[in-house]
Structures are given as structure tokens and as C-alpha cells.
UniProtKB/Swiss-Prot annotation:
<keyword id="KW-0963">Cytoplasm</keyword>
<keyword id="KW-0131">Cell cycle</keyword>
<keyword id="KW-0961">Cell wall biogenesis/degradation</keyword>
<dbReference type="InterPro" id="IPR036615">
    <property type="entry name" value="Mur_ligase_C_dom_sf"/>
</dbReference>
<dbReference type="Pfam" id="PF08245">
    <property type="entry name" value="Mur_ligase_M"/>
</dbReference>
<dbReference type="GO" id="GO:0051301">
    <property type="term" value="P:cell division"/>
</dbReference>
<feature type="binding site">
    <location>
        <begin position="132"/>
        <end position="138"/>
    </location>
    <ligand>
        <name>ATP</name>
    </ligand>
</feature>
<dbReference type="GO" id="GO:0071555">
    <property type="term" value="P:cell wall organization"/>
</dbReference>
<keyword id="KW-0133">Cell shape</keyword>
<keyword id="KW-0573">Peptidoglycan synthesis</keyword>
<comment type="pathway">
    <text>Cell wall biogenesis; peptidoglycan biosynthesis.</text>
</comment>
<protein>
    <recommendedName>
        <fullName>UDP-N-acetylmuramate--L-alanine ligase</fullName>
        <ecNumber>6.3.2.8</ecNumber>
    </recommendedName>
</protein>
<dbReference type="InterPro" id="IPR013221">
    <property type="entry name" value="Mur_ligase_cen"/>
</dbReference>
<dbReference type="Pfam" id="PF01225">
    <property type="entry name" value="Mur_ligase"/>
</dbReference>
<dbReference type="GO" id="GO:0008360">
    <property type="term" value="P:regulation of cell shape"/>
</dbReference>
<keyword id="KW-0132">Cell division</keyword>
<dbReference type="InterPro" id="IPR004101">
    <property type="entry name" value="Mur_ligase_C"/>
</dbReference>
Amino acid sequence: MSQDQPIVLDPTYASFDAAARPADLGATHFIGIGGAGMSVLAEMLHAEGVAVDGSDRAHSAKTDRLETLGITVEFGQRAENVAQAETVVYSSAIKPDNPEIVAAHAAGKRIVHRSDILALLMNGKRAVTVAGAHGKTTTSSMLSHILVNAGADPSYAIGGFIQGPDGTTLDGGHAGKGDILVAEADESDGSFAKYHPTIAIITNCEADHLDHYGDEAHYRAAFVAHAGRATGHVIISIDDPDGLAVLEALPADVKSHTVAYGTTARESLPDLGGAAYVWIASESETAGSGVEQLTLHLPAAVTAGEPVSQSVALKVPGVHNARNAAAAISAAVLLGVSPADAANAAGTFLGAARRFQVRGTVKQVTVVDDYAHHPTEIAALLDAARRRYPDSTIRVIFQPHLFSRTKFFAHQFAKSLAKADDVIITGIFPAREKQADFPDISPSTIVDAAAGLKDASAGTWIQPVEDMCLAAKMMAMRAHHGDVIFTVGAGDITDMDQVLLTALEAHRESCE
């Protein structure tokens, strides 16, 4: 990057070729090292022997974890933080005027997007990428869990923690000794164009991130291109119309090594153009049992032998998790795990952190935290909640994520949230956006949309409450024995769980 040129940060620009390896980076500095995706990559490079440090705005569980590994984290972003670095890594949340970007540019240092680091880590590995609007973290976590149980010791880069036994969490990054790497492939900024995986899993192609892609056609085209870069197999859900449209748009040579999956029986589907098909025969969860029963009908193209009908009993609820399991198990079998071993391991998977994660129970009121931040994810979450807690009142505190997403999907959010009994909408988590650019968008945008739904929202109490702490106390006051309260969203709503549990204990507590 020339020092005389203006600073342009392009996450789609590929900085490395297939021959590059971690040792080529030299001392590496991460801007925003505590971010979900950044911390995982920093930890993996550290395990590869690269000298890693970073900066962030504030302490977090992620930065604490990195510091325990011996990685230096500076708090506050300043020019001097990059003085010793040869490579500086940024995410799409970092702007060109960031003081560390400016200093690195002035010094002629190598500046690369986080996706460049992930692409480099894939070099020389059998890489499995998991892309899609929904289900990336759960699917990649489940696949990693299956492979670990199979003794493969995979590397994995997952944008979150994995639920372990007894309420523990396992880190989402690991540099294994095996030749497999499992990674979430973030489609939000187009940077997954750099990846050339052995297996490309596409969990869902429903429209999202239209602030980047502009329209649904360009969004779907990005998935078609991503599938075309897979050197082995493509695994794609066709339960949604957009997924089926992507499959239909694939060139014939790509379809020939594509495995579609879904809940519709094969004979009821249109011609798949030569793609194989995994049918998910899902049985309803026995009310309140905590077990999702299904049968996967795996074709010969997956098993490399005779077709197999494999029973699976999942501890993660909902039809959406049956789909996630179909993708994870299919990929594991393609990588050499037996169908039975893959299914057994999937049955011991407890979920990714912040995915239907029970945080506590007070006075017979259960608090569950979930990352859902798209209308389809919220609908799937609440459907699963009704299956898991059939006799309970379902209450939701929802923090919208991004003003643009709230604007695009206000009516869809209202319709999905109508599946709950009580809903409070908190202030919007801005992430990379600014309220000033969306002056008319607020929690009331969704509440107003709900008012126009008529029958769909009948019986659902829904209110806007900007302050999350106040929202938690209000919901605690409304709760009764046997209720389930969900904190929902991709922002910092998860930090309210302890406030909510404390408020439930006393029905009054300050947030101080």
C-alpha cells in the first residue's frame, strides 16, 4: 500500500497467495483483538508460533483469555501500538481514520483484513467453510465437535464460544495437529470471496447484509461464486427458496459435486440437476423432553458406498438445528467419519454459546440467552422454545442489531416476535452504524409494525424500552413461576442476564 495514496480498506482484496504460511507474517498486531472473529485468529496464529499482540477499547472475556495465553493487549487504540508490527490486521468494523491504521499506512506496513489471515490458515489444510445467513456458528461448532470426538484434532475458527458440560464454555479457536480446518465464512462484507475450501457449507441464503450487497440478486450471486470456489464438495440447504435458487444457478460441473439437504422428501422436490440430496426426516420433539429426534437419509454420494438412514438424537432443540446437524454430519462423513460415529457425537453436542443457552433459574423462572438477530432466526428460536417449554409463558427482551437491519426488516421482526407472549424491544445496538444516519429508526419502529399486523400479533404484549437495565427489571416484574424469559440479540444484551436474574430474585434491584 503506497504511503502517498489515500487509505482504502477493501475487505475483498486478497493479500496472500496459496503458498503463504503464518511464518510469513512476522510480528502481527490485531486492531480490535477482542472481537469474536479477531480473538480466535489471534489465538490460532499465536499457537502457530507467530508473535501476536493487539489492542481493544475495553477489557472483555476474550481479551482476558488472550492475556492468559501470553498475548499482550493494549487498551485504547494509539499509533504507538503498531510500532513493532510487520503485519497489521483489521476487521470491517475498523475505519480508515483509526489511528493505528493511519500509523501503519504511514510506516508502509502490511495491512490486511481478518479474512486474509483465515485464508492463510486454510492453506495446506482440508478446509471446511460454513457460510449463510443463519446457523454458521452452530453448524461449524457441531462439525468441530464431531471431528474432535473422531480423533481428527482439527483446527477451527468459530466466532463464539462452544457450550461445554456443567455450564462451562470452550473457546472457539483451536490450532489442531490434524489436516482439517473448520471455519465460519462471514458473508456480511464479501470477504469470503478469498476462500477456496475443500468443502463449502451454505446453511441459508435468505437476504441479509443488504447494506453491503444492495439487493438480493447480488447477495445470492456471492453465494453462487463462493460455491464455485470449492475444490471438493458443496453442501447447501434448499429448505428456503433462496437456497434452492442458488443451487439452480450453479454451473453443471459444480452441481455434480453438490449435496443439497432439507426436510422435504426427495420425490416432492424439483429436478436438482445432478446434485445429491440428504433428506431430514424430523420427528417432533417429545414435549419438554429436551431431545430432537430425526433420521438422516444419506445418499451414496455422501457415504461413498451404500445409502444410509441414520438416526440422530440432538440435545439442541428445533428444526433449524436438525438442518444444522444434517450439514455437519454430511461434512464429517465426507471427511471420513462413519455416519454412526458422526451421529453419536452430534448427539452429545450441547450447542454454541449464546444459542438457546440457559443462564439460570430463579423462583422457577428460567432465563435463556440467544444470539438470534434476524427475523427468521427469532422465529426458529421461538418455535423451538414452544417445543422445549410447551406449558410456559414465553417472554422476550430483544435488542435489535444495526439500524439498517431494523429498517429493512421491521415488519418481519414484528411477525416473528408475535410468536412470544410478552416482548420488550430495547435500544438498537449500532455496531458499525450511527444513529444520526437513521434518525427515524428506533425500537418503536418494530412496535409500530407490530400494531399493523392485527391477527398475527393478537395476544402479544410488546413495548419499547430503550434502557436494557430498565427492560430487565420490567420483565422481571411481569414474570410468574414457570415462565421462560429469553434475552435475544447479537449485541450486548447478553450482559443483562445477571441483572435479570438478580431482579427476579428480589423483583427490585438497581443496575449500579
